């Protein structure tokens, strides 16, 4: 599913300005850019675009209230200065599984005054010597890197087992309901085009059916009457 269609699906007739959370995971951006997301999403606080084939966040709109941004499993290699310009209140950023190779690529994040948590799992930069020390030195206001603070204390609410229980428990039932609603809404989107195409054909069929429903004798009288009216009009024109 492309990103624009997924946006419509997630909104479900809500106004963009009212949305506080938006999940676009696993949809596709053919050109590697963010598509369809605009500054109308001014109230957005959580945005997830995991595995959407992103190469860049250059066209990310201004989202002044955004606090948490999930960008894992994409192909982003730089251009992070955009985040400082357009998401000034960001507190959590997940760039795991991207093409971040050098510490200096993260330098623009210094301009995010509220950034507390940064995840870079499965990025090449994590293989560098003194990786953790270097990141904490570069970003002194950062509290957690890859789920741990500078003293290797684990961040709260990051227990994988607890998260699994929540996802497989109550959230599991909600996810099933959401999936069903998404399928229904997606079918409605697909049916809209078919309905528009079918309306013209139905109009033509209705006209044919109207003629067939009229008894043959009455239809003959109606045709003769129409012809008579045309002859009278011709006579009046001659006079």
UniProtKB/Swiss-Prot annotation:
Region (Disordered) location: 149-239
InterPro entries: AN32, Leu-rich_rpt, LRR_dom_sf
Primary localization: nucleus
Gene Ontology CC entries for this record: nucleus
Residue span, LRRCT domain: 123-165
Biased composition (Basic and acidic residues): 216-225
LRR repeats: 16-40, 43-64, 65-87, 89-110
Ranges annotated as biased composition (Acidic residues): 149-215, 226-239
GO terms, molecular function: histone binding
UniProt subcellular location: Nucleus
Similarity field: Belongs to the ANP32 family.
Free-text comment about domains: Histone binding is mediated by the concave surface of the LRR region.
Protein name as it appears in the record: Acidic leucine-rich nuclear phosphoprotein 32 family member B
Source species: Xenopus laevis (African clawed frog)
Record lineage: Eukaryota, Metazoa, Chordata, Craniata, Vertebrata
